[in-house]
Design a protein with these regions (language model features):
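Predominantly late transmembrane helices and immediately cytosolic-facing juxtamembrane segments
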Residues: 1-22, 29-196, 210-239
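N-terminal signal-anchor/initial transmembrane insertion module
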Residues: 205-209
Length: 239
């Protein structure tokens, strides 16, 4: 797939723009849908899931790195404020949520071809980018605060829903039930509604988002620790 995309992209670069653009888009679209087609036609399709998770996680780390670069301006002497600290806490909450799911909860030995894992990371990447962009807009007095708040929460929603959607591939005792999904959705909806109501006050919006993401992470951590203690042997020196 990578080879096909490379060939078509280089071929597109050699052609006139009115032809090259079609070849380029064909290459992108073909390699986007090929994993689905291949796994449907090849019943013995196998994948090294731990290796795949490791590689995708590296891309997520890079995306979080871009978020850190976006936050760097908030930690200068001229711009440092309570927003800087709250944004950093939000980023940590999202980071812990992601790696709690994909580094600890997911079953790396289960029957998972990895296709859903791959495609579900597109909204994760898009969500993180949307959050990064929104951070500067929320504190910009010239920005439309209702739109900035909506865009910010759309990013969080994309990220969180994509992460939680992989819960069906977790270890058997760590698969989320309806109550877990409902509680996570409830936390998000409360945060969204309150933030939209106070969208004219950036500090309030950022504070609500901080508490919301923290509540989501605490809920996941409590679920993970309780289930692990009950059905598995914890390997935590702290306990």
């Amino acid at each position: 797939m990578t080879g096909l995309r490379t060939v078509l992209v280089y071929l597109a670069a050699l052609l006139p723009i009115h032809l090259g653009i079609h070849v380029y888009m064909t290459g992108i679209l073909l390699t986007f849908i090929m994993p689905v087609l291949l796994t449907r036609k090849v019943s013995h399709f196998q994948i090294n899931l731990p290796h795949l998770i490791e590689r995708i996680s590296l891309l997520v780390i890079i995306t979080f790195g871009e978020m850190i670069m976006g936050l760097a301006d908030f930690f200068t002497l001229e711009h440092f404020s309570i927003h800087s600290i709250l944004y950093f806490i939000i980023m940590i909450n999202l980071f812990m949520n992601y790696f709690g799911q994909f580094d600890h909860a997911i079953d790396e030995k289960g029957e998972n071809k990895g296709i859903f894992l791959i495609y579900s990371h597109y909204p994760i990447f898009i969500g993180l980018i949307m959050i990064t962009v929104s951070m500067s807009f929320l504190v910009n007095p010239e920005a439309h605060h209702l739109f900035a708040t909506s865009f910010f929460y759309a990013g969080i929603g994309l990220f969180q829903s994509a992460v939680l959607s992989n819960g069906r591939f977790n270890k058997s005792y760590l698969r989320y039930n309806k109550f877990f999904y409902g509680f996570q959705a409830g936390i998000f909806l409360v945060g969204l509604i309150l933030s939209l109501l106070f969208s004219a006050y950036p500090t309030v919006v950022i504070s609500i988002a901080t508490l919301m993401t923290l509540a989501m992470e605490i809920h996941f951590t409590h679920f993970y620790m309780a289930q692990t203690k009950k059905f598995s042997t914890p390997n935590w020196e702290l306990f």
